[in-house]
């Protein structure tokens, strides 16, 4: 099985594909944008919850660091959830310009966020949690969201 770092980095790539699909559909029709936006939000929320409910909890339990990088990542997740909510609202009122502006802001935040996780947090997590990688990955894969 892969490492925690490999698993979560790969999942970033999967979410990026949903984002690209969402951007592409926005240029074609608002209905297509709505569907792909919902798919992106769902998959991104699943990724956030895999981190927050499993990996962050395991990392904090093992290291005792609760106010460090995981706290910052949770804060950034909340910022991105807020942007995604605003994207939904813009699509609900057919405001394509606002939607596109929000997606641009989200893309920048996501890129910066993912870089921090992939270059800092995931290697730290792997260092502390490597003995439990398989169990942690299995737990993350079992996350279900509504």
List the predicted regions and their residue ranges.
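Small-residue-biased structural context
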Residues: 1-146
């Amino acid at each position: 099985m892969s490492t925690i770092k490999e698993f979560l980095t790969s999942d970033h790539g999967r979410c990026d594909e949903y984002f690209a699909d969402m951007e592409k559909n926005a240029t074609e029709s608002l209905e297509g944008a709505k569907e792909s936006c919902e798919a992106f939000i769902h998959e991104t929320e699943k990724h956030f919850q895999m981190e927050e409910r499993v990996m962050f909890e395991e990392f904090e339990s093992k290291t005792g660091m609760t106010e460090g990088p995981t706290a910052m990542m949770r804060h950034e997740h909340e910022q991105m959830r807020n942007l995604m909510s605003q994207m939904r609202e813009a699509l609900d009122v057919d405001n394509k310009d606002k939607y596109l502006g929000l997606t641009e802001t989200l893309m920048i935040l996501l890129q910066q966020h993912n870089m921090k996780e992939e270059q800092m947090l995931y290697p730290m997590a792997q260092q502390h949690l490597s003995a439990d990688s398989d169990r942690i990955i299995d737990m993350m894969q079992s996350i279900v969201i509504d």
